[in-house]
């Protein structure tokens, strides 16, 4: 059973993961409007950055319409109660970028690594703690690690100073049992004072269900986004999660009607590619592929006259992970040569 008295930390990711859905092209006016609506609806934190984190704007990942710091400052200017979060991937963002994000208004940082590479996060986690930031370890592609292995990686991040460890279903490839096993393993090894979080993707339509199961196993923080705005088929849709949680009597602290209105009136009209489960986004969950590969794979498929589905499935077979976007072209050329 889920503790109905426990306050769930609602972490919105519309302005970070949602960047993938608009090719990192949110205007400053758009981020301010979305953030204001989220703040008024009662979310606890609002993550702001390029889809691939601080300094993700690049040829490899896609150029942003603005800098991370401009987006963060635009949000900081309008929010009254929610804390601003940001994402940092070691090797893309640096501690200098983190300081700039802090100066712009960010007070939570999620330091993200592949689920086998927690050791590269030490410098960034320690520096974030020295700034007094709420510091989170974010283990991407968690389906590619065993529950025990993932827990060991989480313990490493905790030892560096992380105050919360996230199970991150970047591929939207896990089911409820997968989530339960990973949270049980985490709770077995982490200090009771260390929180845990869930970041779902909706590629198998399990984003909300997986988030609820995470709560059943002691999860403290839940990521979600308006309309599910995010990579692939998106994240757990925030307005849906909040409605489901309310029907279960859970303490999420948000105004469901305000979330629904913000989703429909502000965010959904911005989707140039509808965020939903379809042939291509289902391929991500089916093959266990990093969700942000979607738009890159679609571009490669269009360029070479191939099926996006086939490219994504082959990427899954090769166990490609975040940061290997350049391999999408290699896979496309291999498929082309195979006829």
Curated annotation (Swiss-Prot):
Q: State the disulfide connectivity.
A: none
- GO BP terms, alphabetized: catabolic process; L-leucine biosynthetic process
Question: Which residues does the record give as Mn(2+) binding sites?
Answer: 17, 199, 201
InterPro entries xref list? 2-IPM_HCS-like, 4OH_2_O-val_aldolase, Aldolase_TIM, DmpG_comm, DRE_TIM_HOA, PYR_CT
Q: Where is the active site?
A: 20
Recorded E.C. number(s)?
4.1.3.39
Q: Where is this site: Transition state stabilizer?
A: 16
Q: Which reaction does it catalyse?
A: (S)-4-hydroxy-2-oxopentanoate = acetaldehyde + pyruvate
Q: Does the keyword Zinc-finger apply?
A: no
Q: Matching SUPFAM superfamilies, A to Z?
A: Aldolase (SSF51569), post-HMGL domain-like (SSF89000)
* Listed Pfam families: DmpG_comm (PF07836), HMGL-like (PF00682)
UniProt keywords (A-Z) are: Aromatic hydrocarbons catabolism, Lyase, Manganese, Metal-binding
Q: Which family does it belong to?
A: Belongs to the 4-hydroxy-2-oxovalerate aldolase family.
Q: What is this protein called?
A: 4-hydroxy-2-oxovalerate aldolase 2
What is this organism's lineage?
A: Bacteria, Pseudomonadati, Pseudomonadota, Gammaproteobacteria, Pseudomonadales
């Amino acid at each position: 059973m889920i503790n109905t008295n426990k306050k769930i930390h609602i972490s919105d990711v519309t302005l970070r993961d949602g960047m993938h859905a608009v090719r990192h092209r949110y205007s400053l006016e758009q981020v301010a409007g979305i953030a204001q609506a989220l703040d008024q609806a009662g979310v606890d934190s609002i993550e702001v950055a390029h889809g691939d984190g601080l300094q993700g704007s690049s040829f490899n990942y896609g150029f942003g319409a603005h800098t991370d710091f401009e987006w963060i400052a635009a949000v900081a200017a309008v929010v009254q109660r929610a804390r601003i979060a940001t994402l940092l991937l070691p090797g893309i963002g640096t501690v200098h970028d983190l300081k700039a994000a802090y100066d712009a208004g960010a007070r939570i940082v999620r330091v993200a690594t592949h689920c086998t590479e927690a050791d590269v996060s030490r410098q960034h986690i320690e520096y974030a703690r020295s700034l007094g930031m709420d510091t989170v370890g974010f283990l991407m592609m968690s389906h590619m690690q065993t529950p025990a292995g993932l827990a060991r990686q989480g313990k490493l991040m905790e030892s560096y100073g992380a105050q919360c460890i996230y199970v991150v279903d970047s591929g939207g490839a896990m089911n409820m049992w997968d989530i339960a096993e990973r949270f049980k393993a985490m709770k077995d090894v982490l200090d009771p004072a260390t929180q845990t979080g869930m970041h779902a993707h909706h590629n198998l339509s399990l984003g909300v269900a997986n988030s609820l199961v995470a709560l059943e196993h002691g999860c403290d923080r839940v990521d979600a986004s308006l309309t599910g705005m995010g990579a692939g088929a998106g994240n757990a849709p925030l307005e849906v999660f909040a409605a489901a949680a309310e029907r279960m009597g859970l303490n999420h602290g948000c105004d469901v009607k305000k979330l629904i209105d913000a989703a429909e009136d502000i965010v959904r009209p911005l989707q140039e590619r509808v965020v939903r489960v379809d042939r291509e986004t289902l391929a991500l969950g089916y093959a266990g592929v990093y969700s942000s590969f979607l738009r890159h794979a679609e571009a490669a498929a269009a360029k070479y006259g191939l099926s996006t589905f086939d490219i994504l499935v082959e990427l899954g077979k090769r166990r490609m992970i975040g940061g290997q976007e350049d391999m999408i072209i290699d896979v496309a050329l291999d498929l082309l040569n195979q006829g």
